[in-house]
Regions:
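Short amphipathic alpha-helical segments
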Residues: 11-16, 20, 73, 138-149
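Short, surface-exposed coil-to-beta transition loops
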Residues: 1-2, 74-79, 101-107
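Glycine-rich portal/gate segments that line the openings of hydrophobic small-molecule binding cavities
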Residues: 39-94
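Beta-strand/loop substructures that line and gate deep hydrophobic ligand-binding cavities in soluble
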Residues: 50-51, 82-83, 88-144
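Hydrophobic ligand-binding cavity/cleft-lining segments
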Residues: 1-60
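Short, solvent-exposed secondary-structure boundary motifs
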Residues: 25-34, 68-74, 96-102
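Soluble, non-transmembrane catalytic domains of enzymes that act on hydrophobic metabolites at membranes
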Residues: 36-45, 94, 107, 116, ...
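A conserved amphipathic terminal alpha-helix motif
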Residues: 77-83, 134-162
């Protein structure tokens, strides 16, 4: 599934740096409304990686009712991202723990479009512990309604913080 957002009045380089800063990741977690564990950031010669565990309740506003039926009352997930230094591409992985368990992997790209940066993430979600034929519906729901929503919040925070 393709997710698109625009981050206004900035450059690709500035967005790449912003997306892996501790203050930005904390602001993202706060905006999403999750409890986050320790945010870990590592920067080597090839890429910068960031990861953080999240926990949030599913009985709150903004979580679709279908999602509430399939997800546990409290969701535990791990958010991981990597941005290469050599080009404007990155990888995202979200692992949802519990039942159903799910892994969402994504390929992200940033491109300059005039004064703005277009942020595109293509994701795929796989679940386990969900009987057929519900698995595909749950994967689509997690991909669109959970991960897609988190990515839209990420862009909103980037527009505000950037």
């Amino acid at each position: 599934m393709e997710h698109r957002a625009v981050i206004e009045s900035t450059t690709v380089e500035a967005v790449q740096q912003l997306l892996s800063q501790h203050a930005f990741l904390q602001a993202l977690a706060t905006e999403v409304g999750v409890d986050t564990g320790q945010i870990e950031i590592s920067d080597d010669t090839d890429a910068v990686q960031a990861s953080m565990p999240w926990a949030f309740r599913t009985d709150r506003a903004g979580i679709p009712s279908l999602a509430q039926k399939f997800l546990p009352q409290e969701v535990q997930l791990d958010w991981w991202q990597q941005w290469k230094h050599s080009d404007p591409d990155g990888d995202i992985r979200v692992e949802l723990h519990g039942r159903p368990a799910a892994t969402c992997t994504g390929r992200a790209s940033l491109s300059q479009n005039g004064d703005d940066v277009e942020y595109v993430v293509v994701t795929e979600t796989k679940t386990s512990g969900v009987p057929w034929p519900l698995g595909g519906k749950v994967e689509s729901m997690i991909n669109k309604d959970l991960v897609g929503w988190i990515l839209s919040v990420q862009a909103r925070v980037a527009n505000r913080e950037g």
